[in-house]
């Protein structure tokens, strides 16, 4: 029947379980579909079909009925879960702070004329692994498809004032970032369920006060946030935005990003930081974005080149990757190189070797890392117990700060993994628009100064790397590679794995290892050519 087909089309995009705000019951898809047939509008549509099938009217009435609201809040102790609420009417739950929170959410949604509501506390049967997996991936889609998202600000009391939202605990949580970002319409409520700052407008996301506070909380402009879409793009920007947000469970640092990146991963609570490792490994494999490797600190249990905590991505433009050279600078430098005594044939060979490299990828927990390798010579400790110095042929004397006792390692290598930078293929951090420094307070000061100067632009030509804006011959392209190779870069410190000499592990450093190719002699060029390879990193 035409009406039932329209109903099935409508509920296909709905969450698996919804709260019927009238009855207070949890209903699955079959019950959601059946509920429409009990409405007077259903019988009116049936009667009207005796003479003419009005498809537009059917679609309008069905879609109007299946509008739903989503809930965004910070989880608390003793939340009403699916296994409890499935047996009882929401409005009959015994008195408690968390029960009252759910009941008020449902009442506000019901009073707004919406029949359906969804809360992550009771609308996900977390005991069903398939259902939990589906929900974590589909959540962004559900928030985007909602008529409104109700945000509950526990701890924000009436009368609320500007700044309360910025300081709220809701604004520190990992899950709430995607919930706010994905929702088209949002309304904020204080903890007594009055409107935040008495903003009696349909959509708080359009309020200048809210826009200003969210920019202050993230350090990023509203327009730039709107430009971000789910998918494996702008990876560094997204990781940066969530890097300071918190989760109760370690695994949720990764699982809360599945929808943002449109990635499906097996959900295994109890795996700890392996979850973040699996997420980052899949992102690196699908995108080839080496900015995922640009961090300093302790590595996780999944792979030594992936961190244990997402907070290491707090810098939008990581100093590990050299800054892009402007076209004017490049023209000046390469013109000088072209007239110098450099061995152009060796430079061309190096350029060819780099171009042949694949993008990095993972096979299980093993990373295939394209890079240029620099072997460290003798290592000695400086006056500081945690600072070591070593000699390398092409990089000169290198200083490394680490808790590790470097002399105990049999051999050590510094690697240059930023091949995309050398070939000008993938600039990092070229889209996010940063709020000017004077417009934000100290709470967003973790955004780097260099990042603040970036402005969003709708002109795709201006986002392209300089070398793609004009055609050059192969020799000029090779000279540009040499120019970039001489820029300071953050190297990764690797050592052969003790149990597998064909593989390597990253050695944790406390600070950035900044190095630079000092001179481009024929001997150095030959060493560089022979040092271009793909390493197995565990």
Region locations from a protein language model:
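A structural "flexibility-hinge" signal
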Residues: 1-64, 69, 73-112, 126-130, ...
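Conserved hydrophobic ligand-interaction patch in extracellular adhesion modules
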Residues: 117-125
């Amino acid at each position: 029947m035409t009406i039932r087909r329209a109903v099935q089309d409508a509920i296909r995009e709905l969450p698996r379980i919804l709260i019927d705000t009238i009855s207070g019951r949890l209903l699955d898809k079959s019950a959601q579909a059946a509920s429409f047939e009990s409405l007077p509008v259903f019988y009116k549509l049936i009667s009207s079909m005796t003479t003419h099938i009005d498809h537009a009217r059917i679609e309008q009435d069905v879609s109007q009925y299946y509008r739903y609201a989503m809930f965004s809040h910070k989880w608390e102790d003793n939340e009403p879960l699916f296994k409890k609420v499935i047996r009882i009417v929401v409005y009959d739950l015994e008195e408690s702070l968390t029960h009252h929170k759910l009941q008020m959410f449902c009442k506000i949604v019901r009073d707004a004329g919406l029949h359906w509501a969804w809360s992550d506390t009771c609308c996900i049967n977390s005991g069903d692994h398939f259902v939990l997996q589906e929900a974590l991936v589909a959540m962004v889609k559900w928030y985007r498809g909602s008529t409104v998202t109700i945000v509950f600000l526990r701890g924000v009391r009436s009368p609320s004032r500007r700044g309360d939202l910025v300081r709220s605990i809701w604004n520190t949580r990992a899950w709430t970032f995607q919930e706010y970002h994905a929702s088209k319409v949002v309304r904020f409520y204080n903890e007594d369920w009055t409107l935040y700052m008495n903003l009696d407008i349909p959509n708080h996301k359009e309020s200048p006060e809210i826009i200003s506070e969210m920019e202050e909380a993230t350090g990023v402009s509203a327009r730039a946030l709107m430009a971000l879409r789910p998918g494996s793009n702008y990876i560094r920007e997204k990781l940066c935005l969530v890097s300071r947000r918190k989760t109760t469970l370690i695994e949720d640092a990764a699982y809360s990003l599945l929808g943002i990146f449109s990635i499906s991963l097996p959900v295994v609570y109890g795996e700890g930081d392996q979850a973040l490792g699996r997420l980052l490994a899949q992102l690196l494999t699908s995108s080839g974005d080496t900015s995922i490797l640009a961090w300093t600190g302790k590595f996780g249990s999944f792979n030594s080149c992936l961190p244990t905590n997402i907070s290491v991505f707090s810098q939008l433009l990581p100093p590990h990757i050299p800054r892009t050279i402007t076209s004017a600078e490049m023209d000046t430098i390469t013109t000088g190189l072209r007239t110098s005594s450099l061995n152009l044939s060796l430079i061309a060979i190096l350029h060819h070797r780099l171009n042949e490299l694949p993008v990095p990828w993972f096979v299980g927990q093993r990373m295939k890392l394209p890079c240029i390798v620099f072997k460290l010579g003798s290592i000695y400790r400086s006056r500081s117990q945690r600072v070591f110095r070593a000699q390398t042929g092409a990089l000169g004397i290198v200083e490394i700060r680490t808790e590790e006792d470097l002399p105990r390692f049999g051999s050590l290598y510094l690697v240059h993994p930023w091949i995309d930078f050398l070939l000008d293929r993938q600039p990092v951090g070229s889209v996010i628009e940063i709020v000017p420094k004077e417009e934000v307070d100290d709470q967003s000061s973790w955004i780097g100064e260099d990042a603040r100067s970036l402005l969003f632009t709708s002109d795709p030509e201006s986002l392209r790397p300089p070398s793609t804006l004009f055609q050059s011959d192969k020799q000029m392209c090779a000279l540009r590679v040499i120019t970039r190779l001489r820029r300071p870069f953050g190297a990764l410190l690797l050592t052969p794995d003790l149990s597998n000499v064909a593989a390597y592990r990253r050695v944790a450093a406390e600070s950035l290892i900044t190095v630079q190719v000092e001179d481009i002699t024929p001997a150095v060029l030959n060493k560089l050519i022979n040092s271009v390879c793909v390493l197995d990193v565990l």
